[in-house]
A protein has these predicted regions:
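Secretory targeting and sorting signals
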Residues: 1-41
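Feature activates predominantly on carbohydrate-active enzymes
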Residues: 123-332, 340, 350-360
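Conserved, mostly hydrophobic/aromatic
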Residues: 71, 143, 190, 211, ...
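Hydrophobic faces of well-ordered beta-strands that scaffold small-molecule active sites
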Residues: 188-192, 219-221, 280-284, 361-363, ...
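Extracellular/lumenal mature domains of secreted and surface-exposed proteins
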Residues: 572-674
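Flexible, acidic glycine-rich loops studded with aromatic residues
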Residues: 401, 408-413, 418-573, 673
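Contiguous, structured surface segment used for ligand recognition
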Residues: 41-185, 516, 532-560
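Active-site neighborhood of glycoside hydrolase catalytic domains
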Residues: 322-413, 419-420, 425-438
């Protein structure tokens, strides 16, 4: 009665269903009792890392993480990053991985601060040099942020099963490699709209976890819009007591109840982001997109902070204002002449700025029709609000509409370009206007960065059917749209010198929970992360190279419990690993023998076979959570049953095959003693 103790390999087999198997990458070997193995393929000329590093040189041999491995820090400043790495590695490996200082030894991971000459071109402080050899792995960076980015690369150099939240057999190997890496742009963001549909702090923290793994460094949090105001503002209880009651669809389509965060919630999200080296930038859109503010405060005649006549804040289409829980835009505006407008906005800006880690504060500024506010009145509000933001030591950011006629914002203010060229609307004026005014530009052209757009749309095509819009992408925006563009040349007159970075925008009209958000965000945000990080010259290998490196991320996202769209543009991989423990009781095996990742492939289309190591083979049963129209399938289990006739040591081989994708093999050793 003993159990599976030795797993001796995982390999990808170049075969399709019905073809002759040819093993092109395999690894076998024995490990200590109770360990196991999942040997990865030999190192390729280009490790499957996204974003693609600036420079990669592959060496000979592999580093193996073992029970003796430690994480060695060169200074206390590296300790938090080391703790994060240890916490990440421990569940799948089962290793203690103590964090120590002093000299390193064989099998250690070293995190140290320094000034490598190779990082001289880096102006962000996020660069790192990673050296992996059979003896140790060393990450050197000028800042803890750079160490953190290097750790994200370590994660991807390890086999995908390192992302498992439960014990896996290993072995945990890294190819010998020398990597020099630093970002193209200092700003690489993701915007999440929690106003149109409320999202919990826990959901936002989960997005931070996954975005930071791909070196995204900014969370732009859209906390207010026509349909809801989501953060408590002291002195103005109605903003959340009234302003948070609904979301898009509350008037009968989905009956979404809305919600809000306390300031403690907001601070917790900021702290979680900081631990992942992301800053949080709040946005309260003004002077438009604020029906929730106006409805909340219009009748707030008892608030001592207001002058008793708060109705003068309303310059909207409707007077008195009315809730509108559709996705309509362009019907609300705050009056720039109202003292009450400035009392409310000043409180919001001061309180959110004080709680936020970003050096920037976003004033919004988009989609205000001249029928509500003339350009002069619009510019007056933008200019005055910009002065408040600057007075708090923050830099103004807003949608690129804020670069229009009459606005006079401080040099270095940031315009977020969003409106792509289309027909009679060239869309480029806001970008060139911003540059002419000495502003920096964050590039977010909707047809390349808007994560709320459908993946595919057209006659008889609607993916996903229940989520997403298509106004910016008439036929849909799949991963290729997010990858195949260059921020430094996209708008004539807006060059790399003007571009601060890129940002993906997850607007909230159709997403009601984290699963919806993840499905729309991933894998497209990964493509955008590479656009923002990797030098354009290093992306000349093309989209097919990116897709090859993207393919393993399907297993990693699945193991992390993150929903995503298994786009057919990617040849998603099968990845299999034997169970860490397979009980053999009185010679009988019955139950799970392996776990299998197969993004976008139904369990019914996968064939598994188990060679039990005693000259018998039987079919395995593949089972797990099936996909839906807005969820990827889950991790599958391969199960089998077998009875051994006599005690002994048995080398078991488990093979999984699906149409159109290479088969995969994992091996394990079972020992049965009476």
């Amino acid at each position: 009665m003993l159990l599976s103790l030795l797993r001796t390999g995982r390999s990808r087999v170049a075969t399709l269903v019905g073809a002759i198997a040819l093993v092109v990458g395999s690894a076998t070997g024995a490990v200590a009792l109770g360990a196991g193995s999942a040997a990865a393929a030999p190192p390729s000329a280009s490790p499957e890392v996204v974003p693609k590093p600036v420079s990669t040189t592959v060496g000979v041999g592999r580093f193996t993480l073992t029970t003796r491995s430690r994480i060695v820090v060169g200074s206390t400043a590296a300790t938090p990053v080391a703790a994060d790495l240890a916490a990440y590695l421990r569940p799948a490996t089962g290793y203690q991985l103590p964090i120590v200082s002093g000299n390193s030894r064989a099998r250690d991971i070293v995190l140290q601060l320094g000034k490598p000459a190779a990082l001289q071109p880096d102006t962000t402080g996020e660069g790192y040099v990673l050296d992996a050899s059979p003896s140790r792995v060393t990450v050197t960076a000028t800042t803890p942020h750079g160490l953190f980015d290097g750790v994200q690369t370590i994660r991807q150099l390890l086999p995908v099963w390192i992302d498992s939240p439960t014990l896996e057999p290993g072995p945990w190997t890294i190819p010998s490699v020398h990597i020099v890496d630093y970002p193209r742009y200092a700003y690489r963001g993701v915007m999440l709209d929690i106003a149109r549909h409320f999202q919990t702090p826990a959901a936002v923290m989960s997005l931070i976890d996954q975005a930071s793994a791909y070196k995204v460094n900014t969370l732009h949090l859209h906390v207010s819009d026509d349909q809801g105001f989501r953060i408590v503002i002291n002195g103005f209880p109605n903003l959340t007591a009234i302003g948070s009651i609904g979301s898009v669809g509350t008037d009968g389509r989905t009956m979404d109840p809305g919600g809000f965060w306390t300031q403690a919630d907001y601070k917790a999200v900021v702290a979680h982001a900081a631990a992942h080296f992301m800053t949080v930038m709040p946005e309260v859109d003004t002077p438009g997109h604020n029906n929730a503010i106006i409805v909340s405060e219009y009748n707030d005649t008892t608030n001592p902070l207001l002058n008793g006549h708060p109705q003068d804040i309303n310059c909207s289409v409707n007077n008195p204002p009315q809730w509108n829980f559709t996705g309509d835009v362009g019907y609300s505006a705050l009056c720039p002449e109202s003292d009450n407008t400035w009392t409310i906005l000043s409180a919001i800006i001061k309180q959110l700025s004080a709680m936020s880690s970003s050096p920037n504060y976003d004033i919004g500024g988009d989609e205000v029709p001249n029928s509500l506010l003339s350009q002069d009145r619009y510019a007056a509000l933008v200019n005055r609000e910009g002065g408040i933001v600057n007075g708090l030591g923050k830099t103004v950011m807003g949608w690129a509409d804020i670069s229009g006629p009459g606005t006079q914002l401080a040099p270095g203010s940031i315009a977020q370009y969003w409106n792509p060229a289309s027909g009679s609307d060239p869309g480029t004026e806001t970008g060139t206007d911003a540059v002419a005014k000495g502003m920096k530009v964050v590039m977010s052209p909707a047809n390349h960065t808007y994560l709320d757009q459908k993946y595919a749309f057209g006659p008889n095509v609607n993916v996903p059917p229940t989520l997403g819009l298509h106004w910016a992408c008439n036929t849909g925006c799949d991963v290729d749209q997010f990858y195949n563009w260059d921020p430094g040349t996209y708008v004539a007159g807006v060059t790399d010198q003007n571009v601060m970075g890129v940002e993906g925008a997850m607007w909230g009209e159709t997403v009601v929970n984290l699963s919806n958000v993840d499905y729309m965000v991933f894998p497209r945000l990964i493509a955008l992360a590479e656009v923002g990080w990797t030098p354009q010259a290093e992306r000349t290998s093309g989209y097919s190279d990116f897709l090859t490196r993207l393919a393993p991320q399907g297993a990693r996202l699945t193991l992390a419990g993150t929903n995503f769209y298994p786009t057919p543009e990617v040849a998603w991989q099968l990845d299999v690993t034997a169970a860490a423990q397979i009980p053999v009781i009185n010679g009988q095996v019955s139950g799970a023998v392996a776990s299998l990742s197969a993004p976008g492939i139904a369990a019914s289309n996968i064939t598994a076979s188990i060679n039990w190591g005693d000259s018998t083979t039987s079919a395995g049963t593949v089972d797990g959570t099936a996909a839906t129209s807005a969820t990827v399938n889950g991790l599958y289990t391969v199960s089998g049953a077998h009875t051994y006739r006599h005690p002994g040591t048995f080398h078991v081989t488990i093979t999984a095959t699906a149409p159109g994708t290479p088969s995969v093999v994992t091996t394990t050793t079972l020992k049965w003693h009476r």
